[in-house]
Amino acid sequence: MTAAQVDDGAFLLDVREPDEWAAGHAPGAHHVPMMEVPARMAEVPTDAEVVVVCRSGGRSGQVTSWLMGNGWDNVRNLDGGMHSWAAAGREIVSENGQPARVL
């Protein structure tokens, strides 16, 4: 799925590391680092569209496959990750007081 195809109502699951998240993420995204997903999978809805994102699409692709293998059928990977999100002109916010950017 491309950044332009992501519906505003989608549950955006950002699986990047805390420093990547703090530097810049999509507004309203939910942060669960990749290695924490198995322990925190109850936070991921089964009744809404879920779009998984990382920096470039690799980690999010792995998480998408893992979720699908564990019962989620409403999960899509964001092709190109946050790099494609930013390139598409989608909004990015930061948590560290610096201008938002993709690490």
How does the language model describe each region?
Residues M1-F11, E17-E49, S60-L103:
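Rhodanese-like catalytic fold shared by cysteine-dependent sulfurtransferases
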Residues V53:
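Short, surface-exposed ligand- or partner-binding patches at beta-edge/loop junctions that are enriched
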